[in-house]
């Protein structure tokens, strides 16, 4: 018999345990991501951030429900690989991904919000880029996205260091000429950001 989790008289069937407190669940044929929190302030932070992100143009999974008594949130489950997995398979991402990430950064800067733009925090469903963590960070005046996080979206020294810190192996010989990479990044920024 499959494990079930009941929230506000709604029953969710556990399909897969994804982490210590995270589950892929199903209800009435729809797949969701369910997360249990240890502390009330963690859930409150999730609720606050989901509301802040909802008013931006940033794509996030739809929040289905949350329960403050059981310390649980339920959001739409986004299928597929995250952008880091796509990058590790192939150096060239769909141009729509670059267009989306630059637009997302512009919207966040305009709203005076900061998010973690690391590629493993995003999924691409073929049409749009979706931010998964529901986490915002303190806004930093003068923060340079292009010199920090955007470099993680290309085969650079920063990308190599980042993926190795996550426990992935990466062949440093795949890192291209830094001048050519910087030029590609600048052209993307001019095309989609300016």
Where are these regions (language model features)?
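Conserved structural core of kinase catalytic domains
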Residues: 61-99
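Active-site ExK catalytic segment of metal-dependent nucleases
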Residues: 33-39, 76, 133-135
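Structural motif at the C-terminus of the N-lobe alphaC helix and the adjacent alphaC-beta4 loop
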Residues: 49-59
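C-lobe/activation-segment region of protein kinase-like
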Residues: 112, 125-194
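Protein kinase-like catalytic core scaffold
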Residues: 32, 59, 73, 130-132
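ATP-binding glycine-rich loop module of kinase domains
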Residues: 8-47
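Catalytic-loop of the protein kinase fold
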Residues: 112-119
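Protein kinase catalytic-loop region centered on the HRD/HxD motif
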Residues: 105-112
